[in-house]
Amino acid sequence: MSTLYGHLFPAYREYAELTDEARVDWLRRDRWISLPQAEAALCHLEDLVIYPPRGRMPCLLLFGSTGMGKTEIVSRFSKLHAPQFDIRTGLSRMPVLLVQMPPEPTEDQFYTELLTALNCVELSSLSVRSMRAEARHLLAEVETKVLVLDEIDKMLAGTPRQQRVFLNTIRFLTNDLKIPIVCAGTEEARMAVLTDPNLADRFGAFELMPWCNDHALRQLLASFSGLLPLRRPSR
């Protein structure tokens, strides 16, 4: 097999022996490809996990154009810090909480998504004030170290007032819980976040640079050609 499928990485050669249907199914599944830019972003995120609590916690904007892998990076970060059940306390620890932004940046929709990510199901009868209190309580209880908000672009669908209220909510949570917040989105969303001077001071930025014809792109293509279970080498 090593000679027959020498164009593939050794760990992936067995998949070339699968049926066509099984190989198509394999190709459709998500998988992580370790590339320098993505690994550099993960290093920035890892620094936030171990950051000690203080009055003004550092936060991060992970931004780039559509298709640059923002969601894949924050999903990978979340999986590397998956929830762990503590037998002694009977509680799950969730060091990294990944939340997708709701379609509109209203407080009730935001806290609904946040509490849903915290596995809270009884939400229909809760007021915004109650949801805020419950979110603060649960985030502290599960010992969340970093809160990640993906697709922060959806904030732009709100009115100027809704956007200001949402930015105030971010600032409130990071101040109250003393945890970093990561926002992933486009350049436009980054500029919107930075309109709040209080947030601009604490949000660092990591830009995912667009692909160009350089070593990084060739490395990406080489990775694909080595792991895709094609029985013949690409030319």
Predicted features along the sequence, with ranges:
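Post-Walker A helix-loop "phosphate-sensing" segment adjacent to the P-loop in P-loop NTPases
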Residues: 79-90, 120-122
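Conserved small helical "lid"/interfacial subdomain of P-loop NTPases
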Residues: 209-235
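Walker A/P-loop nucleotide-binding motif
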Residues: 54-76
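Mid-core helix/loop region of P-loop NTP-binding domains shared across ATPases and GTPases
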Residues: 4-19, 23, 42, 106-113, ...
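Conserved catalytic segments around the Walker B and adjacent sensor/switch elements
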Residues: 84-102
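A short beta-strand-to-loop transition that corresponds to the Sensor-1 phosphate-sensing loop
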Residues: 151, 183-189
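A short helix-turn-beta junction within AAA+ P-loop NTPase domains corresponding to the substrate/partner-engaging
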Residues: 194-210
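A short, basic N-terminal segment
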Residues: 1-58
